[in-house]
């Protein structure tokens, strides 16, 4: 039972269902993608060194995503855990802020490692994931972090469709 069931949100003339997914890929850059159903609503990337040197820019992005989707639709968030070569305090801090915000709002969080995402899509390495996301979106100008966030959301949604996710 949905705790905060509301009327569907309208965005650019389209009705957004009550279930949405925010997929986040933290690393040297923060890639994010917002899905509803298997349709990609929006995606982007933020550079930690330039845009996140001051946390106000990150908080502004978070407020935008929150107001656009999560506050209204109470969707599911995916956060790639801070593994791999980029193990900085900033990465862990951002993952912590995201998880804390989600838990306080009763939004379930599922962590999925980027390597398992790529394996489930049957792609090899970064270039394979980037090619998959570029082909799926029809956008040849995605960053690697955007591509990983998009692939992560797609894997979750496909598993949800097949009944493998209980949430």
Where are these regions (language model features)?
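Phosphate- and other anionic-substrate recognition elements at nucleic-acid/protein interfaces
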Residues: 1-167
């Amino acid at each position: 039972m949905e705790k905060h069931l509301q009327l569907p949100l309208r965005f650019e003339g389209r009705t957004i269902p009550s279930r949405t997914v925010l997929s986040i890929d933290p690393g040297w850059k923060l890639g994010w993608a917002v899905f509803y159903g298997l349709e990609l609503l929006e995606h982007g990337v933020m550079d930690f060194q330039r845009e996140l040197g001051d946390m106000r820019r990150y908080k502004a992005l978070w407020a935008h995503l929150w107001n656009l989707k999560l506050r209204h639709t109470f969707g599911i968030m995916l956060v790639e855990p801070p593994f791999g070569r980029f193990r900085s305090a900033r990465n862990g801090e951002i993952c912590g802020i995201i998880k804390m915000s989600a838990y306080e709002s009763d939004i379930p969080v599922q962590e999925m490692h980027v390597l398992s995402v790529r394996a489930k899509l049957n792609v090899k390495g970064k270039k394979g994931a980037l090619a998959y996301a570029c082909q799926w979106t029809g956008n040849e100008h995605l960053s690697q972090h955007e591509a990983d966030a998009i692939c992560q959301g797609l894997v979750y949604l496909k598993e949800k469709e097949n009944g493998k996710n209980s949430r």
